[in-house]
């Protein structure tokens, strides 16, 4: 089963605009559908293709890259001979799948693109890419596209639903509530998406009517794969990325979700673990959210990287991690989450899905922690804005509520302290759309529209 993915249109743009002058690199975590997408695109948009899967190719294929790059006529002659087909020039594509496993193929892109006979699509897991490029020249002829797990709309498409998202978009655009019945139905579907997640294998199992035990088993295998790859990186670089990754659910259970190194090692300090944290975030299996010391438009200039939160890249994987040691069956636990009856801290799941949706929408993730003395108080208290983004050249603060709770003290004190001119102020919560007191309240499923 091949799912419809939004990034397909970006590949079309690359093909048209590049005109063979760059290769495209699909970057992302393992098991998010990069290889499937590349193959589907090759079948649909070219007359012919060759797939080089470097997890399977033998040394004969690899030796072509090592021995024939100085003579590209010989390179293609030997490649076509070993693959049993000849490609039409200017009408065909060659896929370098899992290129991280054979960095010399990636380095060859510079010469192959300059040659101009064929287009090239590369796919790679960022965990392995980052550790395997130390000794090669990264080609400037690469156009990189970041790919993420399936978002809510893609999940709806996979379920055969082309109706729901246009309704959500219309409500958001017109700033009108959907109505209780429609909102309740969409929230149930969205909770199902949170539970299943956006990993294509898990979504496929769900659309086939498989039990949640089976879906959870698939996701556990993906988590094990991530942890084993991180462990390999740790062994080679004397880092603790695998430990950092494993503690994410426990970190998010903290009252304010801030990352505490004491949960990794009681004597741990940021400076000793900064590379491991960066590796988890840059590998796109985790989403880092950084504190800014001032709510200014150039948020990155005020980033305090030692004060951060770390979310999982896919909320469905977080759900599986949370439920790992639960006494109940996965079937019962998943249904409890879908029907909003789960006894565990749902706030961490909801905050994680909002972080994921904002990241997929193209935002870097920041939050703001500040001290303020409210009127009538004799001492400063600490407050926090969950997320801060920039829209229309103005700061846009975002608060996330795991229920219908509408308190907005943090917004009020933020405006009071900094005399801030904001774009919009959003509270993302579990109820229907509404506007009140200068604040826009949007349901969880609209977070990706910001």
Q: PLM ranges: what are they?
A:
Residues 95, 119-125, 146, 155:
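Structural recognition of the conserved hydrophobic beta-strand(s) that form the central parallel beta-sheet
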């Amino acid at each position: 089963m091949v799912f419809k993915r939004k990034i397909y249109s970006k590949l079309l743009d690359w093909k048209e605009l590049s005109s063979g002058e760059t290769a495209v690199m699909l970057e992302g975590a393992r098991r998010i559908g990069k290889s499937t997408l590349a193959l589907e695109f090759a079948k649909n948009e070219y007359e012919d293709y060759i797939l080089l899967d470097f997890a399977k190719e033998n040394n004969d294929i690899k030796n072509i890259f090592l021995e024939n790059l100085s003579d590209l006529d010989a390179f293609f002659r030997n490649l076509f001979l070993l693959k049993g087909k000849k490609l039409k020039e200017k009408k065909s594509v060659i896929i370098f799948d899992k290129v991280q496993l054979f960095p010399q193929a990636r380095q060859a892109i510079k010469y192959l693109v300059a040659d101009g006979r064929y287009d090239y699509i590369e796919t790679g897991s960022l965990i392995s890419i980052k550790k395997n490029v130390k000794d090669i020249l990264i080609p400037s002829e690469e156009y990189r596209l970041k790919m993420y797990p399936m978002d809510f709309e893609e999940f709806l498409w996979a379920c055969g639903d082309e109706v729901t998202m246009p309704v959500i978009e219309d409500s958001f655009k017109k700033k009108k509530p959907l109505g209780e019945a429609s909102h309740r139905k969409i929230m149930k579907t969205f909770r199902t998406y949170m539970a299943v997640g956006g990993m294509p294998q898990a979504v496929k199992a769900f659309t086939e009517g498989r039990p949640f035990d089976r879906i959870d088993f698939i996701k556990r295998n993906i988590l094990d794969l991530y942890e084993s790859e991180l462990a390999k990186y740790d062994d080679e670089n004397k880092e603790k990325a695998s430990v950092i990754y494993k503690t994410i659910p426990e970190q998010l259970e903290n009252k304010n979700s801030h990352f505490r190194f004491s949960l990794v090692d009681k004597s741990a300090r940021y400076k000793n673990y900064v590379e491991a944290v960066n590796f988890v975030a840059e590998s796109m299996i985790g989403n880092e959210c950084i504190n800014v010391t001032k709510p200014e438009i150039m948020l990155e200039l005020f980033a305090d990287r030692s004060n951060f939160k770390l979310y999982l890249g896919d909320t469905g994987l977080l759900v599986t991690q949370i439920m790992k040691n639960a006494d109940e069956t996965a079937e019962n636990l998943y249904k409890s989450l879908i029907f909003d009856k789960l006894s565990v801290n749902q706030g961490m799941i909801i905050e994680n899905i909002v972080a994921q949706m904002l990241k997929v929408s193209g935002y870097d993730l920041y939050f703001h922690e500040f001290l303020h003395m409210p009127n009538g108080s004799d001492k400063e208290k600490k407050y926090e804005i969950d997320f801060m983004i920039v829209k229309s050249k103005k700061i846009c603060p975002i608060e996330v509520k795991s229920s219908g709770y509408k308190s907005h003290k943090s917004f009020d004190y933020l405006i009071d302290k900094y005399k801030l001119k904001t774009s919009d102020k959003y509270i993302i919560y579990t109820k229907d759309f509404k506007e009140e007191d200068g604040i826009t309240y949007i349901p969880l499923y609209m977070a990706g529209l910001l």
